């Protein structure tokens, strides 16, 4: 068998259904849209959430909450991600962005205690969880809130 003799397995490729190409095709005349009505017209159809004139669910339910304009979202770094740095490294937010550990700094960096830390590091971040502080200090490293 040669490359030009390869054939797709039977039934693995679905043939595109061309509508409006004669009665014999099975999808001629109205092209599977039925007779008249909003859904038969070009550009026709109802908007998402429309329930035929009945008050839609999203309007029947009460509004809840608000968006806090002062919300701070922190970029999360876990302990096991810090293992990629050499012993004695000073880990700063700039270094974390540069090495691709976090994509962008957002409102700051928060170090969480997931995973285990194997290196002695000086970590500078905006926030630390209690378990992260414990793990960093246990390895002889230091943490600094900036």
Swiss-Prot record:
HAMAP family in alphabetical order: Ribosomal_uL15 (MF_01341)
GO molecular function: rRNA binding; structural constituent of ribosome
UniProt organism field: Staphylococcus haemolyticus (strain JCSC1435)
Gene Ontology biological-process entries: translation
UniProt subunit comment: Part of the 50S ribosomal subunit.
Residue span of region Disordered: 1-56
Function recorded in the entry: Binds to the 23S rRNA.
Annotated GO CC locations: cytosolic large ribosomal subunit
SUPFAM superfamilies, A to Z: Ribosomal proteins L15p and L18e
Encoding gene (name): rplO
Biased segments, Basic and acidic residues type: 1-13
Stated name of the protein: Large ribosomal subunit protein uL15
NCBIfam families the record matches: rplO_bact
Gene3D superfamilies to which the protein is assigned, alphabetical: 3.100.10.10
Biased composition (Gly residues): 21-35, 42-52
């Amino acid at each position: 068998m040669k490359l030009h003799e390869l054939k797709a397995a039977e039934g693995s490729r679905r043939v595109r259904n061309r509508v409006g190409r004669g009665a014999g095709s099975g999808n001629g005349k109205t092209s599977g849209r039925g007779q008249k009505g909003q859904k038969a017209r070009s550009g026709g159809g109802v908007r998402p959430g429309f329930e035929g004139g009945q008050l839609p669910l999203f309007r029947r339910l009460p509004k809840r909450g608000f968006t806090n304009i002062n919300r701070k979202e922190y970029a999360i770094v876990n302990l096991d991600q810090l293992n990629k740095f050499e012993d004695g490294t000073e880990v700063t937010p700039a270094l974390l962005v540069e090495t691709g550990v976090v994509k962008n700094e957002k409102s700051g960096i928060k170090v969480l205690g997931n995973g285990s830390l194997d290196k002695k590091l000086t970590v500078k971040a905006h926030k630390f969880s209690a378990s992260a502080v414990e793990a960093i200090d246990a390895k002889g490293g230091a943490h600094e809130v900036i």
